[in-house]
């Protein structure tokens, strides 16, 4: 009994210690698990939050840096584009064939509602390797909402059974394209409204052009335009071979090569490829620089000289010498011993034509004109001022450039008729692949043709064959896109020219309504 009592307290003590130790271990284990849970839960959350904040900051910074980089890249691209713009003289618009375009417009107008209003949209792109000109025609759903202030200039062309030749109008369209691509850029350049209207009161089908320049900011204007174009043409061509023309070399001012001359012996009509640099060698070039006022006025009147425009010197006469760049720059190597005199005035009514044109007979020129009228091809796009190659060749009998008389007051000649040859120094050599420096700022153009004040007025080159079939009004349309005010300034127009310049009153009202 005593032994049992003696052994009882240690057992109880041991049992109590065991329970205490067990409880201690259990509590410490629970505390350890709680700490582990807290360590597993709280620290990762804080770490992820910090990383998220860092990522957000880095993302915004990267986005801002990326936007700044894109802006810098865009600015640099625009700068590069500005330095690599190719002028229009390096673009061969002879590949444009707008005959199908005009025929499609006529078929649409004659088949549907006798009225077809459309937008001629011209967009051009440029690079070192190619150029692309897109010509699209969009149908206008409601032409009455067109603001006439944005399209102030209107030109109409009457197409009837008597005037069924579309070469003049297609030449006008080519000139519009050439004017809009005066500097090829990657922006929207030009917009013109074309309308084809047929009325029962007249036998004419009026093709009207409302010319105006606009951009992509005219959202209200483009809302009324159908999304898909009715007619869409894209012309691509390489320009790497004509990059030398922008550097002022004389390669573009050559008339024809020997191979072309051999091909022209059967007197087939072949248009020589002449760029604006060749046409710019025609007008008078003043050696002294023009005043700032003249430059400002010329830039305000004509911001960009259209392709194929012949400019005439219209500044006041001065005592400075006026020299003229010859037509055939490096073609004259030797002059014949006996120079032939050259007349200073030419009568267009003479059947044999101008003496400097080496034509075999009048029948050949008539056949050429008929062939030009019969073919549906376009006139040469450099302002339809390009003559056939054999017409552009100077006569071999003309010899050296003879000095001619010069009036003290140069007039504003509308179109060249006589090749004026003023005093050119005999010691001026014609070096191949070189061309005398010209001052393009001195070229100014007149709005409308004015009658010559004197018989021996200063003029440039003979009137081309293609120019003769154009009425004076259409000549001015293709040149400057000015209104038909030619007949007001020049009163000796024929009735046919006046009928082309002045629109009928009903048609004028119809155009005003639209």
UniProtKB/Swiss-Prot annotation:
Feature: compositional bias, Polar residues: 384-398
Q: List keywords of the entry alphabetically.
A: Glycoprotein, Secreted, Signal
Q: Predominant location of this chain?
A: secreted
Stretches of Low complexity bias are at 403-415
Q: Any S-S bridges, and between which cysteines? A: none
Q: Where is the signal peptide?
A: 1-29
Record keyword Glycoprotein present = yes
Which domain of life does the protein's organism represent? Eukaryota
Q: Which GO terms describe its cellular component?
A: extracellular region
The listed locations are: Secreted
**Spans annotated as Disordered:** 379-420
Q: Does the keyword Glycoprotein apply?
A: yes
Glycosylation is annotated at 58, 97, 139, 161, 179, 200, 217, 232, 321
Q: What is this protein called?
A: HERV-H LTR-associating protein 1 homolog
Q: What is the lineage of its organism?
A: Eukaryota, Metazoa, Chordata, Craniata, Vertebrata
Q: Which gene encodes it?
A: Hhla1
């Amino acid at each position: 009994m005593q032994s049992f009592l003696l052994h009882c307290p240690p057992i109880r003590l041991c049992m109590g210690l065991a329970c205490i130790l067990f409880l201690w271990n259990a509590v410490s284990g629970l505390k350890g698990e709680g700490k582990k849970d807290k360590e597993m839960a709280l620290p990762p959350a804080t770490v992820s939050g910090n990383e998220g904040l860092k990522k957000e900051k880095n993302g915004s910074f990267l986005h801002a840096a990326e936007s700044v980089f894109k802006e810098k890249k865009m600015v640099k691209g625009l700068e590069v584009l500005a330095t690599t713009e190719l002028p229009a003289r390096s673009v061969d618009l002879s590949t444009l064939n707008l005959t199908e375009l005009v025929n499609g417009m006529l078929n649409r107008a004659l088949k549907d509602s006798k009225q077809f209003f459309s937008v001629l949209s011209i967009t051009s792109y440029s690079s070192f390797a190619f150029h692309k000109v897109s010509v699209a025609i969009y149908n206008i759903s409601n032409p009455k909402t067109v603001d006439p202030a944005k399209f102030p200039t209107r030109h109409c062309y009457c197409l009837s059974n008597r005037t069924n030749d579309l070469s003049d109008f297609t030449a006008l369209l080519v000139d519009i394209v050439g004017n809009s691509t005066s500097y090829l850029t990657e922006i929207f350049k030009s917009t013109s409204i074309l309308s084809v209207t047929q009325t029962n009161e007249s036998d004419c089908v009026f093709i009207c052009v409302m010319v105006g320049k606009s951009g992509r900011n005219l959202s209200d204007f483009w809302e009324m335009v159908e999304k898909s174009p009715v007619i869409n043409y894209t012309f691509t061509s390489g320009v790497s071979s004509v990059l030398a023309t922008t550097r002022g070399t004389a390669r573009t001012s050559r008339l024809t090569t020997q191979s072309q001359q051999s091909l022209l012996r059967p007197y087939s009509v072949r248009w020589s490829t002449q760029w604006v640099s060749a046409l710019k060698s025609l007008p008078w070039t003043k050696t002294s620089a023009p005043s700032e006022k003249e430059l400002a006025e010329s830039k305000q009147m004509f911001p960009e000289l259209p392709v194929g425009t012949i400019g005439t010197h219209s500044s006041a006469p001065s005592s400075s010498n006026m020299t003229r760049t010859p037509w055939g720059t490096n073609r004259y190597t030797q002059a014949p011993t006996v120079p032939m005199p050259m007349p200073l005035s030419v009568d267009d009514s003479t059947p044999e034509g101008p003496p400097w044109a080496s034509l075999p007979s009048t029948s050949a020129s008539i056949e050429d004109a008929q062939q030009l009228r019969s073919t549906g091809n376009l006139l040469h796009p450099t302002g339809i001022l390009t003559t056939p190659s054999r017409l552009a060749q100077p006569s071999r009998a003309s010899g050296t450039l003879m000095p001619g008389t010069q009036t003290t007051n140069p007039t504003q000649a509308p179109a060249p008729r006589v090749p004026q040859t003023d005093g050119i120094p005999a010691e001026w050599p014609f070096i191949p692949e070189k061309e005398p420096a010209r001052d393009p700022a001195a070229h100014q153009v007149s709005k409308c043709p004015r009658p010559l004040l004197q018989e021996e007025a200063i003029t440039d080159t003979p009137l081309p064959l293609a120019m003769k079939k154009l009425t004076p009004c259409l000549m001015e349309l293709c040149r400057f896109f000015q209104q038909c005010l030619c007949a007001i300034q020049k009163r000796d127009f024929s009735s046919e020219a006046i009928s082309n310049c002045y629109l009928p009153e009903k048609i004028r009202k119809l155009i005003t309504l639209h």
